[in-house]
UniProtKB/Swiss-Prot annotation:
It is found in: Plastid, Chloroplast thylakoid membrane. The chain crosses the membrane at residues 1-21, 44-64. One of its GO terms (cellular component) is chloroplast thylakoid membrane. It comes from Guillardia theta. This is Probable protein-export membrane protein secG. GO terms for biological process: protein secretion. Belongs to the SecG family. The keyword Transmembrane helix applies. It comes from the Eukaryota.
Amino acid sequence: MLNIIWLITGILLLFAIMIHNPKSQGFGTQNQIFGSTRSAEQTLNKATWFLILLFFILTVVLSINNEF
């Protein structure tokens, strides 16, 4: 079960990183989804950091479970 969550988290993390625009202008349809560019970037940054943390925690938990 944790393996599936870890896999989904990894895929979502890749997607979140790929939709970041390096020039901080956001992605094309963000005005339709969010109220402003700044709001979209903040939400995307929070989601990305959450996924990074979740991925790291799951990686540690899965590696500990494999030892025993």
